[in-house]
Amino acid sequence: SAYDRGGGGGAGGFRELKSPSTPYTASPLDGYSTPGNRITVTATGFPIAVGGGGAADNSPPYTVGANGSVSTFSTISSAGGGGGGRGCVGSNGGSGGASGSTGTGCTARAGGSGNTPPTTPPQGNNAGTTRDHPAYAQGGGGGATAVGGNATAGVGGPGGAGATTSINGSATTLAGGGGGGTDGDSANKGTGGPGGGGCGASGPYPGSSVAA
């Protein structure tokens, strides 16, 4: 089917602030030194919202998955990941969602933009580009520390890599982008980015998803 070619979804925005007095190894995206990022924690309540992944859209043609929802701690927000496109351009988000392709005669499309809205350090990266007729394949979604991979002939692009932090006591990689889908051979679907990105799908079958 022309509508089974979905781009990888982008990871949700990754933001980390580590005080120099805190004894753990932060990711390269530690924003503590950036003016305006710090929050003084006191013995009071803070608004907290834990975002989730966006839902797929299974109604062709030319559809795009929903973006993830925003996560918030006090005044600091991380954008939801951009939804992957299926026959259309992927969405912008914390990390961008990749575009999808459709029928014969289409041209390759760039993916959605990451770091949307912009933060310092960047909360995410752009998605990869599609590969259209005759060897359809889709780009990978952006990850926290790397862009999504571009599709090549019949091979889905890998999801962008996430960020590694030891905030929970051991090195953990978070916010990887989703792999791009393909037509045909399941061995050629895009791999999910390190940090939880789901693999792409081949043919009419659904890709994998992971918890936000």
Feature map (PLM): residue ranges:
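Low-complexity, glycine/proline-biased repetitive segments and flexible coils/loops
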Residues: 1-212
